[in-house]
């Protein structure tokens, strides 16, 4: 009986070893464990930066949580959410949901192309040059000095949190802190430059593409950016402006 029990125990041990062996297809993960070191978190932030710079195109959404943020402070236009498309290297189009001073909700389109920044009139839907002092630059998100630079050099206390499923994708959740000064060019100068803000990144384990990015502000406010549909065909033409009134050339 004792010999039989020993044989059963040995067989169970061998089976357990075989099940976790790479030879049988269950590969030991090379990813850092949750709550890993800042060095391991930075490794994945660097990979995500490379992936953004390699993008041919992507669709993304941008949402401000809590009270709306200014899209055009001079004219009192407040931003709430946007559905956008990016075509490398320098074309972005966003359908934006905004509110006016009187509380009216409007839809407008803003386009960033090499020829300039254009925006539709919420009433006529015709394009014109966007106000020069408008906040938020969609192209800046994907520029070398945008999200990629933040991922590489500006995230303090980077730490792997966990593996999580986002948009049906297996992602690695990395958190850290970034100064408002570095984040403001990306999200429209809404943060205090001298403060540090928690930023969470969800990075696709297979492609290293950023699936989601969240900036946490005080008072239950924040910014959420979600990326999807990467490297699909996207065409963002330069908007056609309406004819200028006689004697008043378009700026």
Spans of features found by a protein language model:
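Short, hydrophobic/aromatic-rich segments at coil-to-beta transitions
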Residues: 54-61, 88-95, 168-175, 207-213
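Generic short beta-strand segments
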Residues: 61-69, 95-100, 175-184, 216
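Gly/Pro-enriched, hydrophobic low-complexity segments
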Residues: 170-243
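A short, amphipathic edge element
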Residues: 149-160
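N-terminal leader/targeting segments and the immediate start of mature chains
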Residues: 2-91, 164, 234, 238-251
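Flexible, membrane-facing loop/turn or short amphipathic-helix motifs
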Residues: 66-75, 102-105, 182-192
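Extended lipid/amphipathic-ligand handling interfaces
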Residues: 45-50, 81-88, 110-114, 199-205, ...
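An acidic-aromatic
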Residues: 83-145
């Amino acid at each position: 009986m004792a010999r039989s029990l020993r044989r059963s125990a040995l067989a169970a041990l061998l089976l357990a070893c075989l099940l976790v062996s790479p030879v049988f297809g269950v590969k030991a993960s090379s990813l850092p464990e949750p709550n890993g070191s800042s060095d391991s978190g930075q490794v994945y932030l660097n990979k995500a930066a490379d992936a953004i710079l390699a993008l041919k195109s992507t669709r993304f959404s941008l949402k401000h949580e809590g009270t709306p943020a200014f899209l055009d402070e001079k004219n009192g236009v407040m931003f709430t959410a946007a559905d956008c498309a990016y075509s490398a290297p320098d074309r972005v189009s966003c359908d934006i949901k905004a509110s006016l001073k009187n509380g009216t909700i409007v839809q407008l389109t803003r386009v960033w192309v090499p020829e300039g920044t254009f925006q539709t009139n919420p009433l006529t839907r015709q394009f014109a040059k966007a106000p020069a002092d408008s906040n938020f630059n969609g192209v800046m998100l994907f520029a070398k000095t945008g999200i990629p630079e933040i991922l590489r050099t500006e995230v303090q206390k980077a730490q792997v949190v966990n593996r999580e499923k986002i948009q049906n994708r297996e992602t690695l959740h990395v958190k850290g802190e970034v100064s408002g000064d570095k984040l403001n060019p990306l999200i429209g100068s809404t943060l205090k430059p001298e403060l540090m803000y928690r930023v969470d990144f969800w990075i696709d384990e297979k492609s290293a593409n950023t699936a989601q990015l969240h900036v946490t502000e005080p008072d239950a406010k924040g910014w959420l950016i979600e990326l999807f549909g990467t490297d699909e065909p996207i065409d963002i033409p330069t908007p056609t402006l309406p004819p200028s009134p006689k004697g008043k050339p378009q700026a």
